[in-house]
Each structure stands twice: as structure tokens, then as C-alpha cells.
């Protein structure tokens, strides 16, 4: 090793040693000179201004006993160290136990001494103490913040040589401010500010050109200019200021105002035990964080912390400024409280947006000293608005017009707000003192935030699958554990709407966005869905058909009589997140009928008068015809017309009806409203006549089927009706005969359900198609008439929606039907579905009416829906056969399953033919729904339903219970072909594929040059052959003729030519090898030898061309993929 290397290693060792020595040193406040007897230092504190008191005596540091330890003693220690004064005393080894000698005991300072050794005491090293009694002190540091009532921010003042002064802001930045904040006991700085705090200082400017690295223990240890020697341009208008972060935070929640409570102590964050945790404790935490009242004092899902537990048994009365001022167990005395008992809170943000079109845009109002006030718009920009949106609930700032101005309808309380954009709250930004404003024009600052939740796929804006915004991308929510409490939060987040239903199973179509939220568990009181407990973002075990959805409502009845048999009450509506009333002027039975139909699928018993509510009057003068489906479709005065001299609008509805748990709005469990509550209907005697009345009441729909046995899930309320016996002509379900309200002998597993429809399929002759999944599509009009759909623009996406709505299956193809008569009714035209809608009526469509005469081409729309599938197979063409019956998939018993049945199944599935059939899958699967116990086909049928069959699978037994088929999707490989190949060369080919056939050199094709895979998975022609060319004509320029007789001379000449060519090639090779060997030997000075000419095989291998090629004599036909064939 060179001396330079040794030198480098030595330097590395020295640097490493120095780095090790400088790490982990306690924060110690002590003189920089060599200590002498009576010097003091503070050890073990989080800053130089606090710690265990240690005194130097007889060459060693020792501690002070806390017997008689008081503020006068602490004042002398702090002044001796250069601090302005003492803040508090600490006993009982609060900063840890020392290890040296106990130097002093029974101190009794008067306050006039300059050094601790001058105070009366028991005597040096005289004591009756242990290190558990070591005294400590907290000094008022050498820095303070002035000019602001907020202890976290202000003008920086520094203590030097007995006086306080300011610091010039030259070179002042966030690193300098962070050092000051840590020196004051705060975690770090939010910003370094030069905003004026309070009246201008009159103190001397002590420092300028401060330049901290960021890790110093105090600002005085940073690089800076000479004390009291500052630049001439440093005036008090340039006094440096800071805004510090709080020594308390919320961690582990889903927003800045919720989570596990953590506090900073001795430079370390730690949690608080929830033993004795109360609402008053949460109030103090929220006040300390600058928020308003807590939403929920306990039970917040916050996860476990990882640091120490600083405090336990906290007991606040709600008036304390900080949590540590409340009575508690003492720092670090948490007992056996683990992190499973960490306390948490959810605080209400001290900001709100008022006067906008939604709850997330409007005038910014902040809460301070018990009242709300607005902000002056001067200097207000996107960074300020960004902080407001974050504080409101982690909303991103809307793109475009982020910062509109609004009328200052409440007093302006804040001016000159300057945010960096990183703050959590507006109150943490630099600003003028509260109430000190210079703002004119009557305007206030505003913000427009971007919504983080949307509904997609619904027929109106207040229903659909839920998607949420996370880190700039939208994603869906899995429906695991999804319930009405989750829906309440989503509807509130969308605009304080009322939740009607929580939906599952991608009810409004599959969402293209990936699932990013799962296992949501809201209490129902949260402000945002993100605030609810949920699995880790992006973690889920769901598929695309499990998207969660909601149905919200912007209108409701404030029921004034819960004992009433009928739904009745004051009508309330929501606008911009605020619920209000409708003026009763001109409110009549037509208006009431529309409302009752909209809310309860019923009619109005009467209009009614109730005592007025407390919300604003939002609408008035409704003039409905009675045929509208939504109260807002009626004419009325503009929003915000508050003139009303009448009572509030109110109604009494005749009962109520709704469907729950269905895949579409037209199917589900039947629920009725009676005696102030919703309940179910028992399926005893439930039939299609009962279903017909339900579907008619819901909107003149046609009943497709009556469902029993809680087909749409079990209800949870009372069972209100049993033994229903409708004749089919009633208008309302309560008009039918039944056992009496609430009288039943049923359980919820007997809840009745229905499937209604506004679609049907008909045959070409107009008859209704009841047992097939193909036919002309007809739509039910609002007047109750069935009509066709013009087929001009009908495509596969439209057909997909129809098949999903009617049968919960996909579309195999579209169909077109000619008009059955010139007078045939057409109800719809130019449908433009995207394929994800759950109802055809949700698709965009032309508003212009169509008739048989105006429908282009005279064709109507039809569909062919898929009613067969293969499941549980390991490949696409193989599996157990399942058929769709009554919207349910079920299998076929394999007892009579054979080649004929397999051929029909494959034909129906769209395959060419069946390769084979078998009974049961391996491994066997659990037996599910079985539709057919036998199936007997001739093989000529187009569908399995056309075969002779028996419904039900009760007689099918054993592990091989289900029919399985292997279908052919195309033609097999047509080879092998000897001495030839196919292009393309594959193991199988799709129908209508054409392949080329080629022969090797010396062979000629006998047959067609192409083959095509035709219907039935057969090739269009037999596979051709390649035959050897037996003779060639020489010199004639003609094509070799297979089988032609050449003369003897021609044959002899051919053989002689081949032999002579071979001899010439060998001679050339020998000469080349000779010359190569000779040159090598000459280069070495050795004579050429025979062995140098005749080298081993390797040198022949190095030749660029082969001597002779026999490939044409040995090539065979190529097989699929490998290109190899057989040798002769």
C-alpha cells in the first residue's frame, strides 16, 4: 500500500471518529470556557434552555438535590447561563438521573446572587439525597416571539448581554426559522415571515446575516454578523419573523383534522393513552390545533402508534389552552397502557365555504374567538386557497378559477394572508393581527375546491356507483360491508343530500376505474367517505362487479307524527348544502301527488298544514300538472325567492312502496310504508297478480316475475303484510286483501320480491317471447303502450344493455325485424348506449319522435342474448355447461349427456363442433343450481332448449352430476405434409382462415396451393401431396417435367456434371488449405509439411460454403411450430 493510500485511510478514520463523537451528544447548556468551581450546565433537556442542573466542583460535574428547590434558585441558574429568566422548576429527576456526585443540597437563593455557588446551601458535597431527587429547570430561552397573540408566530426577539433585541431579515430563511422554533420547543417552522407582527419594535437590532444549517441547538450558534453591528438598510420594517408548527398533531386518520393524538416532549413525538379520555379532552385538543368542536370524542379508528406513550388519565375541563395543562398521570407515566389504547379525535375544521354553488366553493370564513369571519381578498391567491381546501377536508384546489370573490356578508377579520401552500390551516399562514384589517370594496376572499367523490352510471345525478379521487386519480369503492351509513356520508359529501339506499354489485354498470377503497365502515357522522375507517388505499380483494353505489335525494318529508299510519309532514329541499322549506302558497293536490309518487310511489291523500320549520324558504309557487315524475320538473318561482306569507308546504301520502336489494331500480325486495316505518311483505300466496299491482304502482311497469324466499336478500324491519291476494286491477298494494297490517307467521327468509320491466322481447308475429332470449325489443311508454325501437342506429352496445336489464347476461348479437305493419308503434329511436348502463332508458337517445313512416329502412331493433356458458374449465372451449333460466345460471344433469347434446351446446356457443363430452369436472365442484335433470338432442337442434328436456335436477346424484363439453373453435392442423410446409403453420386455425401450401426444392405440389377453414371446422379441400421431380431437361430452358422420359444421353450428362462439380470443389478446398498451412509455417520459420495442409475437421468447418449440400435429398414435411419433418 502506498503512503498516499495510507494517508487517505488515516484521514477517513479520523473523520469517522470525529463524526461518531459529535453524534448522540446530549443537548447541554454550559460555558464554552474551561469550567471552574460553581459553573453550571443543563443536561438531558430537549433544548439548551431546559434540563437537569449540574454543578462543577473539584474537577467533576455533579447534580443538585431538589430539597427546597424553588423558583428563586432556578432564576439564579438561568441568569448564570445567560438566559433571561426561569420558566419553571422540575423535581424528581424529571430530566433523568445523573451519575456523578450530588454537589449541592438545601439551596436557598434570595434571587440577588449571580452564581449558584453564592446561594446558601448545606455545604459542598453535603446532602441526604439520591439521584432520584435531581433538580431540573426550564429557562425562558434566549429567543421569544413578540407582536402576536398566537404563541406559534411573531417577530423574533433575541436576548443578549442583558437586553432583548430584534434580528434583521437579511438572508433569513426556513432553516433559520426552524432552529428558532425548535429552540422554543416547537417541532419546526411552517414559514419564515417578514410580515409585520404588532406595532413596530423600538428595541435595538442585534443581529443580521443569520445563516443556519438547520441542526443547530440555538440561533445564536448559527453563523451571523457581529452583534449590534448590522447593515444600514436593516430597519424594523425588516424584522425577521417565524411561524412555528404546533407541538401536538393528529396522526393516522384520513384527513388533517382527525387521527391519533400525539404530543411532542423532550424532542420526541408520543401518543396519549385513552384511559379516562373524554369529550372535554377532545375539546382541548381541537382548540389547541386551532379547530372548532370535535365531531366525535372517542372510538376514532386511528391505528397504533410506534413511539412512547407520553401521558395517561388526562382529565380536562375544556378550558385549558394545552393538553399538558390538564391533570394527568405525569410525563411517561402511562402504566400498562399500550398503543391499542391510543386516544384519537375528529375535529371540525375552523374554516368553511359559504355562498357558492356547492358546499366546496364560496366565501372563505374562518373561526376565531367563538365567531366566524371572512378574509380580505387583497393578496389572496392560489396558495392561500389551496390551504383553505386542505383544511376543509383535504380537497384539492379546483383547476381554473380557484379564487373567486364573494360579497363580505360577515365581518372581515383577517387581512394580508400570505401562505406558502404547505400549511394545514389558514390560521397558520402569515397574516395581520386578528381584527386589524384595511379592506375596502365589500368583497371577501373565496375558494373553489375540487370534489373528491362522484357518482357515475346513474339515470340522474344523485344515483350511481361511487368513485373517489386519490392522488390525482379516480377509483371505485368495493361493496364489502357497504351499508346505509356509508351512503349517508357519500350523500352528505356530495351536497348534504339525504341517503335513500346503498347499492352493491356494480348496480349502475361496471366502473372502468380500478378499485382503490375497500372495507369502508362509516359511523354515518363523518364529513367525507375518506374520513371513515377503511382498508389501506389500493388494497382490496374485489372484482369489477363489486362496485359500491348510492341513491341520494334532494327532497324529503319532515315527518311530524311518527305514530301516523301514513307518511305525512313538511316538505323540505336542499340547495347548496342547506336544507330549507317550500312556501305553501298555491300548493295543491297536483303538487302533492307528484311529491308522493316521487318519494313513496304512492298518491296524495291530502295537502296539509304543519308548523313552520326553521330553515330558509327556498322555493314557492309550484304549478304541477300531476303527471310529472319529479317535483322539480314543475314550474315554480326562481331559487332564493324568499317572499312567503303562507304556511310551509306539506302533504299526507297514501302509504308508500319501494324495491330494495335489486340489480336495477325495477327489481328487488318489496317494502311498504306503514305506521311510520318501512317493512317487508311475506311470500305466502305471493304470485304474479300481486307483482302486477306492485309494478303498476311503481310506474305502470309490466311484471316480469314474482320472487319468493328473500331472492333479493332479507329485510331488517318489521314484516307488515302476509297472505296478500290481489286480483291484479288494484292501484295500490294496500288496496289488496291481506291478513292485516303487522299480522303474519313469517320470517325474513320469506320476503317477497318482484322483477318489473319497461322492456320485453316479441316474436316477428308480435307475440311475446316468454321462453327465449331473442326477439324484437319493445319499450313501455309513459302512457302504458308498448312500442318498438327504430333499428337504424341499433348496435351491439345497445343490445348489451337490453340483455343485462332483462336477463343479467351479455348480448351475443343484434337482430333486425321489419315493421309488422305500417301502423306499428315506435317508442324510441337513435339510442346511443355505451354498454355500461343498467337500464335502456338511461342511454342517450334522440328527442325527436319516430313513426313507422319516419324510421329509416323500416327496420326495428332486436337482440340475441346469451343464455349458455362454459364454467370452471381450464380453457375457453372446455367446461361445465350452464344455461340461463329466469335470470339465474344453472347446470344440466349429465345422466343422458352425450355427443349429440355436446354438438348442440357447441353450436349454440358459436363453436364449429364438439370434440368430446364427459360427465363431471375433475376436480369436482360443489353442486349448485341445476335447471335440467335430463337433456336429449338429435344433434340438429340450434339450441339446447329446443331438445327434449326435463326441468329440475333433484334426481341427479353422484360426483359426476354436471354435463361437460369440449368444443372446437376452429380447424386442426392439416398436416403432416411430407417434403412441404404450411404458411402460416399453427396447431389450430380460426374459421375462414386461408393457408398456403409449399413444397421443398426438388418436389412439386400435387393439388391446390391453398386451404381454407370452412364452417364445421373442416378444410375446404383434402391436404395435397409433394412428389419428387424424377427427371430434368438440360439446356432446353424448359421447366422440369415430373415423370417425363429423358433420353439416355441426358441422364448420363447430368451424372457426369454432378461428379465433375464435386471434384472441382474438393480441389479448390485442398489448394486453399495448402496455402494457409504454408503461410503459417513460413511465419514461424518452419518448413511446410503435409500435416500443415491436411488439418483436422475444424478447418473444414471454418469454410464459408459447404463442399456438398444434401439438404434437398433429406428434407421432410414441417410439423406445426417446429418446422421439422420426416427423413426419407
Swiss-Prot record:
Induction: By bacterial challenge in adult coelomocytes. Residues 1073-1128 are cytoplasmic. InterPro entries: SRCR (IPR001190), SRCR-like_dom_sf (IPR036772), Sushi/SCR/CCP_sf (IPR035976), Sushi_SCR_CCP_dom (IPR000436). The chain crosses the membrane at residues 1052-1072. Residues 1-24 form the signal peptide. It is found in: Cytoplasmic vesicle membrane. This is Scavenger receptor cysteine-rich domain superfamily protein. It comes from Patiria pectinifera (Starfish).
Amino acid at each position: 500500500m502506498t503512503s498516499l493510500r495510507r494517508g487517505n485511510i488515516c484521514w477517513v478514520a479520523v473523520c469517522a471518529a470525529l463524526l461518531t463523537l459529535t453524534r448522540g451528544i446530549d443537548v447541554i447548556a454550559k460555558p464554552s470556557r474551561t469550567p471552574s468551581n460553581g459553573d453550571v450546565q443543563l443536561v438531558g433537556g430537549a433544548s439548551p434552555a431546559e434540563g437537569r442542573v449540574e454543578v462543577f466542583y473539584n474537577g467533576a460535574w455533579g447534580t443538585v438535590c431538589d430539597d427546597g428547590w424553588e423558583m428563586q434558585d432556578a432564576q439564579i441558574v438561568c441568569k448564570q447561563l445567560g438566559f433571561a429568566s426561569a420558566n419553571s422548576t422540575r423535581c424528581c429527576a424529571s430530566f433523568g438521573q445523573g451519575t456523578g456526585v450530588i454537589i449541592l443540597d438545601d439551596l436557598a437563593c434570595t434571587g440577588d446572587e449571580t452564581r449558584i455557588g453564592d446561594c446558601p446551601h448545606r455545604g459542598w458535597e453535603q446532602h441526604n439525597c439520591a439521584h432520584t431527587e435531581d433538580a431540573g429547570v426550564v429557562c425562558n430561552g434566549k429567543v421569544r416571539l413578540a407582536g402576536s397573540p398566537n404563541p406559534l408566530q411573531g417577530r423574533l426577539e433575541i436576548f443578549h448581554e442583558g437586553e432583548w433585541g430584534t434580528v434583521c431579515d437579511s438572508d433569513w430563511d426556513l432553516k433559520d426559522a426552524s432552529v428558532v422554533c425548535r429552540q422554543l420547543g416547537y417541532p419546526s417552522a411552517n414559514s419564515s415571515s417578514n410580515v409585520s407582527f404588532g406595532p413596530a419594535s423600538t428595541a435595538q437590532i442585534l443581529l443580521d446575516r443569520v445563516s443556519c444549517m438547520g441542526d443547530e441547538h440555538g440561533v445564536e450558534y448559527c453563523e451571523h454578523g457581529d452583534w449590534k453591528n448590522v447593515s444600514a438598510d436593516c430597519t424594523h420594517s425588516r424584522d425577521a419573523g417565524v411561524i412555528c408548527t404546533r407541538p401536538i398533531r393528529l396522526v393516522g386518520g384520513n384527513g388533517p383534522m382527525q387521527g391519533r393524538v400525539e404530543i411532542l416532549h423532550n424532542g420526541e413525538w408520543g401518543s396519549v393513552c385513552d384511559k379516562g379520555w373524554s369529550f372535554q379532552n377532545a375539546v382541548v385538543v381541537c382548540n389547541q390545533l386551532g379547530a372548532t368542536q370535535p365531531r366525535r370524542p372517542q372510538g376514532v379508528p386511528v391505528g397504533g402508534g410506534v413511539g412512547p406513550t407520553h401521558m395517561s388519565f388526562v382529565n380536562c375541563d375544556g378550558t385549558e389552552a394545552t393538553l399538558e395543562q390538564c391533570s394527568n398521570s405525569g410525563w411517561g407515566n402511562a402504566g400498562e397502557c399500550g398503543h391499542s389504547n391510543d386516544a384519537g379525535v375528529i375535529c371540525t375544521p375552523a374554516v368553511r365555504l359559504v355562498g357558492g354553488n356547492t358546499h366546496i366553493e364560496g366565501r372563505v370564513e374562518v373561526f376565531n374567538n367563538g365567531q366566524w369571519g371572512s378574509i380580505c381578498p387583497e393578496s389572496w391567491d392560489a396558495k392561500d386557497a389551496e390551504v383553505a381546501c386542505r383544511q376543509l377536508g383535504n380537497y384539492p384546489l379546483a383547476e381554473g378559477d380557484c379564487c373567486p370573490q364573494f360579497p363580505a356578508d360577515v365581518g372581515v377579520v383577517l387581512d394580508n394572508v400570505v401562505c406558502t401552500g404547505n400549511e394545514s390551516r389558514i390560521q397558520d399562514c402569515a397574516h395581520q393581527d386578528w381584527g386589524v384589517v384595511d379592506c375596502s370594496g365589500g368583497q371577501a376572499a373565496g375558494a373553489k375546491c375540487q370534489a373528491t367523490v362522484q357518482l357515475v352510471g346513474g339515470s340522474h345525478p344523485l344515483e350511481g356507483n361511487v368513485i373517489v379521487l386519490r392522488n390525482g386519480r379516480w377509483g371505485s369503492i368495493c361493496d364489502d360491508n357497504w351499508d346505509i351509513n356509508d351512503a349517508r356520508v357519500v350523500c352528505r359529501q356530495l351536497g348534504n343530500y339525504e341517503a335513500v339506499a346503498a347499492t352493491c354489485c356494480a348496480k349502475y354498470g361496471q366502473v372502468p376505474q380500478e378499485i382503490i377503497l375497500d372495507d369502508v365502515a362509516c359511523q354515518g357522522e363523518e364529513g367525507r367517505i375518506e374520513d371513515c375507517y377503511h382498508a389501506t388505499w389500493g388494497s382490496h380483494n374485489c372484482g369489477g362487479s363489486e362496485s359500491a353505489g348510492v341513491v341520494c335525494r334532494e327532497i324529503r318529508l319532515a315527518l311530524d307524527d311518527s305514530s301516523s299510519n301514513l307518511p305525512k309532514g313538511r316538505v323540505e329541499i336542499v340547495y347548496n348544502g342547506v336544507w330549507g322549506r317550500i312556501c305553501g302558497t298555491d300548493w295543491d293536490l297536483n303538487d302533492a301527488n307528484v311529491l308522493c309518487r316521487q318519494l313513496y310511489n304512492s298518491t296524495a291523500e291530502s295537502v296539509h298544514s304543519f308548523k313552520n320549520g326553521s330553515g330558509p324558504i327556498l322555493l314557492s309557487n309550484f304549478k304541477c300538472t300531476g303527471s310529472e315524475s319529479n317535483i322539480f320538473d314543475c314550474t315554480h318561482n326562481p331559487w332564493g325567492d324568499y317572499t312567503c306569507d303562507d304556511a310551509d308546504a306539506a302533504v299526507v301520502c297514501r302509504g308508500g312502496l319501494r324495491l330494495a336489494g335489486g340489480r336495477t331500480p325495477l327489481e328487488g325486495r318489496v317494502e311498504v310504508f306503514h305506521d311510520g316505518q318501512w317493512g317487508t311483505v311475506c311470500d305466502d300466496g305471493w304470485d304474479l297478480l300481486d307483482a302486477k299491482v306492485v309494478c303498476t304502482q311503481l310506474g305502470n311497469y309490466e311484471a316480469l316475475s314474482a320472487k319468493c324466499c328473500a331472492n333479493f336478500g332479507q329485510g331488517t324491519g318489521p314484516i307488515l303484510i302476509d297472505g296478500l291476494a290481489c286480483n291484479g286491477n288494484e292501484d295500490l298494494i294496500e288496496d289488496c286483501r291481506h291478513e292485516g297490517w303487522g299480522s303474519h307467521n313469517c320470517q325474513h327468509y320469506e320476503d317477497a320480491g318482484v322483477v318489473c320491466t319497461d322492456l320485453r322481447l316479441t316474436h316477428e308475429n308480435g307475440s311475446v317471447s316468454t321462453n327465449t332470449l331473442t326477439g324484437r325489443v319493445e319499450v313501455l311508454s309513459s302512457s302504458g303502450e308498448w312500442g318498438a325501437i327504430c333499428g337504424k342506429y341499433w348496435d351491439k352496445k345497445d343490445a348489451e344493455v337490453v340483455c343485462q336489464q332483462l336477463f343479467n347476461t351479455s348480448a351475443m348479437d343484434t337482430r333486425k325485424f321489419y315493421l309488422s305493419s305500417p301502423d306499428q308503434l315506435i317508442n324510441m329511436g337513435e339510442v346511443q348506449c355505451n354498454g355500461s348502463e343498467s337500464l335502456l332508458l338511461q342511454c342517450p337517445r334522440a328527442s325527436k319522435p319516430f313513426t313507422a313512416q319516419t324510421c329509416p329502412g323500416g327496420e326495428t331493433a332486436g337482440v340475441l342474448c346469451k343464455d349458455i356458458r362454459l364454467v370452471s374449465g381450464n380453457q375457453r372451449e372446455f367446461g361445465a355447461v350452464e344455461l340461463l333460466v329466469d335470470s339465474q345460471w344453472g347446470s344440466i344433469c349429465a345422466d343422458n349427456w352425450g355427443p349429440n347434446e355436446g354438438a348442440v351446446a357447441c353450436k349454440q356457443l358459436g363453436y364449429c363442433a364438439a370434440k368430446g363430452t364427459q360427465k363431471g369436472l375433475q376436480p369436482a365442484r360443489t353442486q349448485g343450481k341445476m335447471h335440467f335433470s335430463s337433456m336429449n338432442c338429435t344433434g340438429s337442434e340450434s339450441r339446447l332448449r329446443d331438445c327434449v328436456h326435463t326441468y329440475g335436477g333433484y334426481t341427479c346424484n353422484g360426483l359426476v352430476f354436471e354435463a361437460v363439453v369440449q368444443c372446437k373453435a376452429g380447424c386442426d392442423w392439416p398436416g403432416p405434409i411430407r417434403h412441404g410446409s404450411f404458411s402460416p403453420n399453427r396447431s389450430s386455425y380460426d374459421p375462414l382462415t386461408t393457408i398456403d401450401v409449399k413444397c421443398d426444392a426438388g418436389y412439386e405440389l400435387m393439388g391446390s396451393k391453398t386451404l381454407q377453414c370452412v364452417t364445421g371446422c373442416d378444410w375446404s379441400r383434402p391436404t395435397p401431396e409433394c412428389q419428387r421431380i424424377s427427371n430434368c431437361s438440360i439446356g432446353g430452358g424448359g421447366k422440369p417435367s415430373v415423370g417425363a422420359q429423358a433420353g439416355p444421353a441426358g441422364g448420363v450428362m447430368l451424372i457426369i456434371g454432378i461428379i465433375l462439380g464435386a471434384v472441382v470443389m474438393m480441389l479448390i478446398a485442398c489448394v486453399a488449405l495448402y496455402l494457409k498451412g504454408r503461410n503459417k509455417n513460413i511465419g514461424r520459420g518452419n518448413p511446410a509439411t503435409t500435416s500443415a495442409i491436411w488439418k483436422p475437421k475444424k478447418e473444414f468447418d471454418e469454410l464459408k460454403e459447404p463442399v456438398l449440400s444434401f439438404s434437398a435429398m433429406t428434407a421432410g414435411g414441417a410439423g406445426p411450430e417446429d418446422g421439422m419433418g420426416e427423413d426419407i
